[in-house]
Every structure is written in C-alpha cells, then in structure tokens.
Amino acid sequence: MKQLLDFIPLVVFFAAYKLYDIYIASGALIAATALSLVVTWVMYRKIEKMTLVTFAMVVIFGSLTLVFHNDLFIKWKVTIIYGLFAVALLVSQFVMKQTLIQKMLGKELTLPQPVWGKLNFAWAMFFLVCGLVNIYIAFWLPQSVWVNFKVFGLTGVTLLFTLICGVYIYRHLPNDQEKSEEEKSEQP
C-alpha cells in the first residue's frame, strides 16, 4: 500500500500534464505529494526520511516552477533528489559504520557485510546515473519526452534495478541448513 501512495503523485503529475501543461502538473504534483504524505502519516504514523526529502524538493522546485513560470526547476528536481540520495548512500558507506541500505533492510534480511556494501554502492551509482540521464533528457529533448521519461522510464528502470537487486540478495541469503546450524550453535 505504501508503494502505491508513493506512486500516486506521479500519476497525478502525468495526467495533469497530458490534460493541461507542465505548470498545472507541477501544482498538482505538489498537492498530490502533500496529500500522499498526510495519508501515509495517518495510516502508518511514520514517514521515511527519503519521503520527507522528496516532499521538500517537490515543494521547493515545484513552487519555483510556478513562481518563475519556468519548467527548468521541476526538471532539475529529479537530478537533485537522485544526487542527494547518491551522496547520502556514499557517505553512509565510506564515513558511517553502517550503510543506509543495511539500516533500511537489515531488520528483515541477514546478509554478509560485503553484500550490504555492494548493494549500497550499486544503488548510489544507480541514482547518480539516473540523475545524469535526466539532465540529458530534460535539457536536450522535448518536454513531452522528459515527462514520459520521468513517469515511465525512471519508474521502469527503478523496478528493473530493484528486481536485479532482489535476485542478488536472494543469492546471498543464508540457506535453511545454515540457519538451523546457527540456531543450534547459539543454544546453550
């Protein structure tokens, strides 16, 4: 359900763009993201930091787009958000004791430390590449191409990358025999 709530503002943005223009779509994105945030809070009583950062960037860059009537701001939003995510992941990997990926998934998954590092680095590079591709598409191709890329391209490639990471994680999960041996050795 949470993923659906995160996806709704994107659908609203796309529909508003197709029916009206980038400026109405930017305003609709701000409103839909705010509503999604409120619904998430009401349902879960918790909002992830990434969600808050995304909301702040949507409000800032969406508002700048509307105030200055310039679509460059909303186009930069994607690159800046992805850049912030990449930097946060890299800082967690090289400065902190635990990677952000491990902090987010470590309670649900048991993986060797090098696997956490590789996953974290892979996501950082993924966000960096997506941000750079966004710059190219946003500034050298027509606006309609950028909107389709933002809605369908980034969503599709993110789902694909998530699946690839899922397969990678699955390969490194402890098997049932290892789990039962660990449980036996932990018992007095």
From Swiss-Prot:
Topology with respect to the bilayer: Multi-pass membrane protein
Coiled coil: none
Bilayer-crossing regions: 22-42, 50-70, 72-92, 121-141, 149-169
Pfam family, one: IspA
Keyword hit for Transmembrane: yes
Annotated InterPro entries: YciB
Keywords of this entry: Cell inner membrane, Cell membrane, Membrane, Transmembrane, Transmembrane helix
Gene Ontology CC: one annotated term: plasma membrane
Subcellular location: Cell inner membrane
Protein purpose: Plays a role in cell envelope biogenesis, maintenance of cell envelope integrity and membrane homeostasis.
The protein's name in its UniProt record: Inner membrane-spanning protein YciB
